[in-house]
């Protein structure tokens, strides 16, 4: 899984995160800041994800896998039906049902995650995702994927932004295009009505006064339908009027009386018109005002005449105002429509601002000059008064008609006429609504109090569930955490299985084993106790380790993680000898034991501490108690079980089952490799094949689209398991009572005999004393056969089901064969591989070989783990983590809790922080003195806090701005990232 966190310079663009998803997911709600890891997902609604911590993220990846997804469904429920998991884990359904029985939905999800990760690690992401590809694209209404489904958020946004930009743009433009579009029809109707009305009035009045040409031109101009036409005409008439005015200006006083009277008549008309135009807001002037103006303007006649052509008035302000006023007043043919239109469009921007130029000196000069030359000054005043009154009536009629017809003027009701108040209210409401919508869309941050979660562009919370093994969508709700660290954000799994069920989440992985366990309910009941526990143990061992490595980290992540650009899940999963598998095995051990320790003490402590986050996670106190007990048992088993410590089983079959990618099943796949060639198939299709595990040994290969088995010769129980899986299936069928399929028995051997596999576990576990251990499953050639079938030493690992009782022996065999490590050989064999690969790491060039040593010991040594330097490196001191249950003295176990989005989903999005729920990140005490700052170190997906900023972390692709690259040859097998200052 790769994150390319690149900050973009712009404020609006989010940081892009390139993600590959390798885990199946049950229910997914994408909150802002959530990301789908294994899908090529683009999450482009920048308003929505603009705050993760404090940074913008856009989740962007390429299109390659999107076609394989059926899709995400919108759902308001945080917990979707298990049927969905069963649906997309159809291969996994049988065993997932068992997982559902044994473990919670998280188990299903984890089974899905495990099986699907396993699927993902091989071909099955493509296969199983292709089964599910349509729904994601379908649900992409809310989430836009890069490829085919990039419609959703972007489209909703685009729709919104288009409509918004329409409304905003119309508000901004000085042109009246928008309002003309909106009111064209109504205005035409209004004009038709007001045309006849005003025409009759104007004729009756103006004909009597001898201005028939004026009223005719006015009524003619009123019939102009669109403002754009009147605007273009006003341009023409403006030029004509300016020419005519300049001509009239240039005429000397000695011109004939006729020419002066002509220009005077034009000017007098323009004077009254411009004055009424300036009063188009409905402010009529009294007669005394007009007299005052006329007196005031006659005084300046000679001066204004002399200055009119002068260049003192050539400044843009006066020129523009003069031209504007002339264009209204001069050409009488269209002056009315033009004055009305222009004044309205200007009034939009405040109306009053253009009033003074409208009554500028030019008009006053013209009026004064005309009055002085006019013989009948009173007649002119009366004419102007009548025109003003007529214009006011027209304004009132127009406004009344517009309001009656629903015309919405964009000037926010600045009229004083009748209906102005109503229109003002309507405009105010419309504008408020527009602003509300705009603000709502802008404020879709998860931190916005309004939204409290991911909102679609329509303001609805997006809740999506992937109905397919699209893998690790780090969903905060019902997704099972592979490893608490791997799926750090998948704390919802913790909800179901409780944080201890992070082991149970790992158990959900081992719920695949639990499927085996359920299948081997005899074995798996022991193992479901131990498999819920030993699934916690083995899940921690198998699932957390194997899931982390085999499922997500082991194979899928290695395939998807940046450094292994060449490695595809098929390549990695099939290459049993690849160092990645060994690495994955070792890391699986580390992760298993971290999960053990976390779930063991930290969950109890955190739950006992009354942590609300844990309470929100835990579906119920019963689940908490059960999970607590399971995890205690599991942790005890896991501590006692070298399987937890046996990367041999895990890693042996991680080698085998890394191919199976059911490292979860790998431990069980040790036995599950016995059967997880069958049960890896079963674990691949442990969900399926656990029911069919006998068949799944063969059918797992067949049933697993993963065909990890097919890819794994081990995973190909068809190869070995088909041979012995036939035996296994036979033996499974022989042992099917314990394991519904003795491959389940193997899984039971792996699971119950996870207790038997936990013969590392079960060597120490009384489960080894379980009849499961005593079961013919253990004794079954199935267990022995898959042991024989899977690897010779994986057979021994499978025999480690039986021989995992001698897992040290078989694991030695497996260590010899699988490069997995027994407790005896942990210090020797397990470290050499990683030591060869990555001798030094980090700023201090520390030998990280102790990592594998210490983590291999973690399962057995309960209190020594805190003193291990791993705890110092792997734990983080950054403030976003809350350490609970211990001091940093190096001796007390410390849970570093990370806040994730889980309780947002649990609360239905009522909390506005994305990462509200704490999650077990690391159970270690920090020795911060060793580092300047250990920013954050995780196993697998999750958030990394850098500079108090939460950023997604699966496996970092380091660039100049990010932490130093991991010196190990291939960084991909481990999700553990050391981030130094």
Swiss-Prot record:
Bias kind Basic residues: ranges: 196-206, 228-269, 314-358
Positions with biased composition (Polar residues): 554-576, 605-622
Region spans: Disordered: 65-133, 149-463, 491-580, 592-834, 861-891
Superkingdom per UniProt: Eukaryota
UniProt feature, compositional bias: Acidic residues: 75-88
Compositionally biased spans, kind Basic and acidic residues: 182-195, 270-292, 359-452, 623-634
Bias (Low complexity) ranges: 89-133, 149-158, 170-181, 207-227, 491-553, 635-820, 867-891
Name the record gives this protein: Uncharacterized protein DDB_G0287625
Lineage: Eukaryota, Amoebozoa, Evosea, Eumycetozoa, Dictyostelia
């Amino acid at each position: 899984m790769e994150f390319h966190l690149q900050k973009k310079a712009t404020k609006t663009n989010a940081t892009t995160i390139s993600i590959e998803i390798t885990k199946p997911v049950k229910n997914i709600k994408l909150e802002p800041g959530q990301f789908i890891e294994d899908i090529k997902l683009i999450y482009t609604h920048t308003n929505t994800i603009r705050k993760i911590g404090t940074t913008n993220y856009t989740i962007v990846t390429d299109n390659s896998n999107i076609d394989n997804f059926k899709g995400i469904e919108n759902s308001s429920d945080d917990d979707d039906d298990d049927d969905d998991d069963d649906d997309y884990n159809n291969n996994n359904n049988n065993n997932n049902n068992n997982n559902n029985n044994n473990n919670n939905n998280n188990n299903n999800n984890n089974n899905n995650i495990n099986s699907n990760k396993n699927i993902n690690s091989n071909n099955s992401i493509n296969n199983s995702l292709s089964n599910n590809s349509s729904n994601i694209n379908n649900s992409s209404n809310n989430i836009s994927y890069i490829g085919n489904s990039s419609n959703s958020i972007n489209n909703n946004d685009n729709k919104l932004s288009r409509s918004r930009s329409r409304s905003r743009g119309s508000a901004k433009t000085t042109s009246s295009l928008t309002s003309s579009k909106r009111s064209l029809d109504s205005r035409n109707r209004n004009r038709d009505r007001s045309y006849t009305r005003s025409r009759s009035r104007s004729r009756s009045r103006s004909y009597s006064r001898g201005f028939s040409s004026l009223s005719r031109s006015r009524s003619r101009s009123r019939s102009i339908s669109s403002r754009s036409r009147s605007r273009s005409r006003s341009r023409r008439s403006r030029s004509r009027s300016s020419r005519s005015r300049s001509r009239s200006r240039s005429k000397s006083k000695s011109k004939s009386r006729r020419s002066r009277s002509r220009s005077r008549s034009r000017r007098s008309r323009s004077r009254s018109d411009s004055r009424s135009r300036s009063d188009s807001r409905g402010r009529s002037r009294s007669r005394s005002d007009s007299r005052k103006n006329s007196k005031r303007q006659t005084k300046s006649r000679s001066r204004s005449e002399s200055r009119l052509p002068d260049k003192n008035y050539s400044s843009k302000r006066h020129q523009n105002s003069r031209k504007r006023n002339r264009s209204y007043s001069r050409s009488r043919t269209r002056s009315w429509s033009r004055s009305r239109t222009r004044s309205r469009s200007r009034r939009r921007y405040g109306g009053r601002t253009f009033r003074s130029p409208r009554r500028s000196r030019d008009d006053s000069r013209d009026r004064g000059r005309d009055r002085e030359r006019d013989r009948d000054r009173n007649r002119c005043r009366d004419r102007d008064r009548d025109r003003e009154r007529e214009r006011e009536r027209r304004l009132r009629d127009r406004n009344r008609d517009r309001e009656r017809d629903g015309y919405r003027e964009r000037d926010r009701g600045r009229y004083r006429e009748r209906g102005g108040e109503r229109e003002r209210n309507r405009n105010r409401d419309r504008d408020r609504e527009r602003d509300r919508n705009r603000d709502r869309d802008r404020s879709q941050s998860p931190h916005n109090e309004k939204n409290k979660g991911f909102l679609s562009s329509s303001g609805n919370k997006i809740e999506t569930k992937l109905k397919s093994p699209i893998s690790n969508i780090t969903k905060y709700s019902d997704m099972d955490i592979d490893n608490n660290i791997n799926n750090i954000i998948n704390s919802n799994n913790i909800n179901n299985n409780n944080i201890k069920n992070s082991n149970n989440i790992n158990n959900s992985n081992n719920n695949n084993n639990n499927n085996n366990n359920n299948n081997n309910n005899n074995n798996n009941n022991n193992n479901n106790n131990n498999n819920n526990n030993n699934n916690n143990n083995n899940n921690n061992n198998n699932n957390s380790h194997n899931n982390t490595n085999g499922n997500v980290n082991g194979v899928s992540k290695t395939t998807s993680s940046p450094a292994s650009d060449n490695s595809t899940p098929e390549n990695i999963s099939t290459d049993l000898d690849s160092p990645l598998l060994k690495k994955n095995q070792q890391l699986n051990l580390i992760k298993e034991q971290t999960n053990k320790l976390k779930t063991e003490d930290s969950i109890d402590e955190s739950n006992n501490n009354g942590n609300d986050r844990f309470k929100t996670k835990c579906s119920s106190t019963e689940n908490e108690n059960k999970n607590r007990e399971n995890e205690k048992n599991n942790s005890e088993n896991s501590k006692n079980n070298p399987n937890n410590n046996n990367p041999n089983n895990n890693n042996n079959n991680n080698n085998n089952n890394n191919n199976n990618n059911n490292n979860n099943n790998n431990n069980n796949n040790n036995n599950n490799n016995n059967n997880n060639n069958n049960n890896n198939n079963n674990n691949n299709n442990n969900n399926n094949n656990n029911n069919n595990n006998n068949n799944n040994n063969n059918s797992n290969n067949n049933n697993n689209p993963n065909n990890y088995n097919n890819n794994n010769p081990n995973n190909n129980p068809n190869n070995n398991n088909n041979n012995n899986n036939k035996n296994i299936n036979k033996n499974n069928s022989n042992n099917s009572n314990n394991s519904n399929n003795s491959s389940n028995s193997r899984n039971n051997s792996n699971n119950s005999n996870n207790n038997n596999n936990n013969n590392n576990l079960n060597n120490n576990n009384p489960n080894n004393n379980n009849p499961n251990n005593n079961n013919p499953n253990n004794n079954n050639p199935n267990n022995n056969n898959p042991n024989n079938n899977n690897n010779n030493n994986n057979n021994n690992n499978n025999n480690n089901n039986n021989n995992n009782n001698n897992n040290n022996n078989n694991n030695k065999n497996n260590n010899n064969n699988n490069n997995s490590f027994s407790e005896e050989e942990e210090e020797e064999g397990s470290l050499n591989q990683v030591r060869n690969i990555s001798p030094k790491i980090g700023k201090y060039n520390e030998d990280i070989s102790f990592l594998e040593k210490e983590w291999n010991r973690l399962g057995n040594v309960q209190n020594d783990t805190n003193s291990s330097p791993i705890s110092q490196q792997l734990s983080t001191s950054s403030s976003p983590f809350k350490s609970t249950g211990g001091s940093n003295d190096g001796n007390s176990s410390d849970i570093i809790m990370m806040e994730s989005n889980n309780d947002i989903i649990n609360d239905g999005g009522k909390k506005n922080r994305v990462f509200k729920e704490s999650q077990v990140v690391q159970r270690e005490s920090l020795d911060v003195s060793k580092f300047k700052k250990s920013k954050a170190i995780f196993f697998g997906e999750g958030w990394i806090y850098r500079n108090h900023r939460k950023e997604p972390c699966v496996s970092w692709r380091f660039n100049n701005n990010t932490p130093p690259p991991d010196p190990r040859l291939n960084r991909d097998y481990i999700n553990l990232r050391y981030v130094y200052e």
